[in-house]
């Protein structure tokens, strides 16, 4: 799919139902597609290795792609170059497969003048220093940048209960306390299921 909508300056059609589960190359896909701003949040990009220049000059694009599985991405060079409207929180993306030898993250947010979300939790252990032009012209300051050469540990959750004998009777109340190892953004959702209960 590399370059499929490149230079399509009027294109702004829905692509929500596209099956992208076997796609490996999305490089330059929306390069210079200056009108495109559609919901592609549900795309399966888990096999995509090439994302370089994907949204270059896609000046209208500001769709939420925060839940994309980018764990296979190796090359995100200039991905949002001059994507001047883009400002979605992609701080939880997995970029651990990128490295300088594969193009990596050079110029990723260069000229993305609206982008302001922190990416400090990114795992960038393959980079000994900041890639060239990584955030030039964006709103990313030092406090929002990754710690180059480091893969931060993920937040942990510890759940404790007031039930000391591990026996819960029908209709009884159980007090559960959840402690996160770091501040959570928004409201975390915790689902507790039961199993192995005898009637």
Specify the residue positions occupied by each region the protein language model found:
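Serine/threonine-rich, repeat-prone extracellular segments and beta-strand-based repeat modules
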Residues: 147-150, 164, 196
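Cys/His-enriched low-complexity segments
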Residues: 134-135, 166-168, 180
